[in-house]
Regions:
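The cytosolic transmitter module of two-component sensor histidine kinases
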Residues: 37, 82, 105-109, 176
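Short, Lys/Arg-enriched anionic-surface-contact patches
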Residues: 96-108, 149-159
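Basic/polar phosphate-binding segments, predominantly the helix-turn-helix DNA-binding elements
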Residues: 92, 126-158, 180-206
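Conserved phosphate/pyrophosphate-binding and hydrolysis machinery centered on Walker-type P-loop NTPases
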Residues: 34, 79, 102-106, 125, ...
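Basic, amphipathic alpha-helical hairpins
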Residues: 71-74, 90-101, 111-124, 142-147, ...
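Hydrophobic, helix-rich cores of sensory/ligand-binding and other regulatory modules
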Residues: 1-95
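Terminal helix-turn-helix DNA-binding modules in bacterial transcription factors
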Residues: 113-118, 145-186, 208-212
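Amphipathic alpha-helical repeat elements characteristic of tetratricopeptide repeat
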Residues: 16-23, 106-110, 157-161
């Protein structure tokens, strides 16, 4: 099967980042035997995998390598915590692969994702489209057609992962006003609503699960 031949460094960089995220998450889960936390982690990691895979940031071979790496580094008993993750990921890889002739504007999409990763605190669709010298509606259409997500989906997902890093490194629940501002949200209420809509739990509930 053909693989997307994009920027090798960019592809490897994100595959490594994803591997690191899963490693940290698994290590955390194995210390805390809480089923609900495992479900939350599965959801977030799968969401991240889908975003990166659909964006062709890493291809099928790298995704398969990721699953092999998980099995090499964790026992079957440990992987039981994330059994559904592995199954769902395999299914997703098999069912969502699209031929390259349907993949258009890869450079444009890759650039947009890179900008979101690097400037998530202040980036907006208008500024990004201006930098690319294209119409915002055209950029939105390209992202939707190729990644099956919106600009805001990508931006909110990135910000949520940054918020999770805050939670994992905080001994007490961060004040939402400060966290929201640091992430680039206009208010704590807006951040709260976005987090709850994407994760299914409130920031407070997630922090308590991660710190239990």
């Amino acid at each position: 099967m053909d693989h997307y031949q994009g920027d090798p460094f960019f592809s490897q960089q994100y595959a490594a980042l994803l591997q690191e995220q899963i490693s940290k998450g698994l290590d955390l889960l194995l210390k805390k035997d809480i089923p609900s936390k495992s479900m939350l982690f599965r959801y977030l990691i799968l969401l991240y995998i889908k975003k990166q895979y659909r964006a062709r940031i890493f291809h099928l071979g790298q995704a398969a390598h990721l699953l092999i790496w998980m099995n090499d580094h964790y026992t079957k008993a440990q992987l039981h915590h994330c059994e559904k993750l592995v199954q769902d990921t395999c299914h997703m890889i098999e069912s969502t692969h699209e031929s390259l002739d349907r993949w258009k504007n890869p450079a444009l999409c890759s650039y947009a994702i890179r900008q979101i990763e690097q400037h998530y605190q202040k980036i907006c669709l208008h500024d990004l489209s201006s930098a690319l010298k294209i119409n915002p509606s055209y950029l939105s259409r390209v992202l939707s057609q190729n990644l099956h997500v919106t600009f805001l989906d990508l931006l909110h997902t990135k910000r949520i992962f940054v918020a999770l890093e805050y939670f994992s490194n905080s001994k007490k629940l961060p004040q939402l006003e400060y966290l929201a501002t640091d992430l680039g949200y206009s208010s704590a209420h807006y951040f709260y609503c976005v987090f709850k809509r994407y994760v299914g739990l409130t920031p407070s509930e997630v922090w308590h699960l991660m710190s239990a």
